[in-house]
Amino acid sequence: MNYKYKTVLLKLSGEALKGDAEVYDKKCLEDIASQIIHLVKNGLKLGIVIGGGNIWRGKLGENIGMDAINADYMGMLATVMNGLALESTITKMGYDKIKVYSSLPIKTVTDDYNFKKARIKMNEGFISIFVGGTGYSYFTTDTNATIRAIEIGAEAILMAKNGVKGVYDKDPKQHKDAKFIKKISHQEIVDKQLRIMDLTAATLAKDANLKIEVFDMSGDNNIIKVLENKLESTIIE
């Protein structure tokens, strides 16, 4: 199968796993897993970073008086849970060439992150799920996704959004007159402070000349469609 990229980093939000459920929706997990399996079976080298927002938000920490550093680590642990949930779903659907790499050492259920090992395994057809954030507080999963994409030699980050087809000049959920942007530079994202991703991640991607493609994953097989160039999206480069 000819995809527009050979190696990509897929960035998923934690909310993508929950649907209308409280934490996880079986159908959402299976839909994402089936697309991932299809892609890697057809030759795509794929790394994945998942957020933890379906389980933990920093605001929850604030509400109970938790300091920001501990709250960040709880968010990192939430990404571990999400990575294991996706791994389990993919394995149950019959694809067992998969590794979960954690920046936080949890040897019982994950492998310690090592970009060289991840590259080797991806060349062997393994899916690599990167969890635990960067392993340090004050960094978002957007930043983690950008770092991992650079380290595995990805040609692009596929940034999956829920119900938003790409980048707009302002929040389309709050402003009916928001204008869709087909193509934009990393620097414009930073200068205009567009909240499609955090600015540290945008700056890192700019310095590494790493393309980011923002798309709406909520339609049928949209992860596959964006790689087949059959879906409207925003290119950041």
Swiss-Prot record:
Protein activity control: Inhibited by UTP.
HAMAP family: PyrH_B
UniProt protein name: Uridylate kinase
Enzyme type, top EC level: transferase
Subunit-level organization: Homohexamer.
PANTHER family registered for this protein in UniProt: URIDYLATE KINASE (PTHR42833), URIDYLATE KINASE PUMPKIN, CHLOROPLASTIC (PTHR42833:SF4)
Entry's localization field: Cytoplasm
Reactions accelerated catalytically: UMP + ATP = UDP + ADP
Pathway annotation: Pyrimidine metabolism; CTP biosynthesis via de novo pathway; UDP from UMP (UMPK route): step 1/1
InterPro entries membership: AceGlu_kinase-like_sf, Asp/Glu/Uridylate_kinase, Uridylate_kinase, Uridylate_kinase_bac
Entry keywords, A to Z: ATP-binding, Cytoplasm, Kinase, Nucleotide-binding, Pyrimidine biosynthesis, Transferase
One annotated GO biological process: UDP biosynthetic process
Function of the protein: Catalyzes the reversible phosphorylation of UMP to UDP.
Main localization (coarse): cytoplasm
Coiled-coil regions listed in the entry: none
GO CC annotations, alphabetized: cytoplasm
EC number: 2.7.4.22
